[in-house]
Amino acid sequence: MVVAYKLSNGLEVILENGDITKVEADAIVNAANSYLSHGGGVALAIVRSGGYIIQEESDEYVRRNGPVPVGEVAVTTAGKLKARYVIHAVGPRYGIEGDDKLESAIRRSLEKADELKLSSIALPAISTGIYGYPYEICARIMSKVMKEYKPKFLKRILVVVYGDQAYSVFKKVFDNSLYMN
């Protein structure tokens, strides 16, 4: 299941139900924790598919720079994934940190892709796993950020969600918000 949206800022947004580790994009965004310890969910899947080098580079990043603040990002190579980079976005925990931190994590992921002069990025439903964010809130925030963003090099955003329920909610929100350009 795939649906595409063309935004007024020139971005093409593709919503897909699938495995983010299998998509082809210049960068894959990982839903990470502040210590970049990739022990579950999307993070574990990315390390399993891309190789342990991703975890090693993440550990080195934290050793050198300290924990990544909520709402911020860090970058590693992508190992064996069909991408050049993994952008590790630290999303908030629902009900603990605010929606502004989720908005920041998504926006910083797009900005980092532009800083790296990338044309495509794959985004998961950040913070909807163990961090408990409802799909609808994540989808609304994501659509807002994508519509407001002013891309430099970025042309395509693949929003890759896992499961029929997530896909259905994201599609409903995107149909209502991204077609209104």
UniProtKB/Swiss-Prot annotation:
It comes from the Archaea. CDD domains: Macro_Af1521_BAL-like (cd02907). Pfam families: Macro. Residues 1-178 form the Macro domain. Gene3D superfamilies: Leucine Aminopeptidase, subunit E, domain 1 (3.40.220.10). InterPro entries: Macro_dom (IPR002589), Macro_dom-like (IPR043472). PANTHER family: GANGLIOSIDE INDUCED DIFFERENTIATION ASSOCIATED PROTEIN 2-RELATED, MACRO DOMAIN-CONTAINING PROTEIN. NCBIfam families: PRK00431.2-3, PRK00431.2-4. This is Uncharacterized protein Saci_1252. It comes from Sulfolobus acidocaldarius (strain ATCC 33909 / DSM 639 / JCM 8929 / NBRC 15157 / NCIMB 11770).
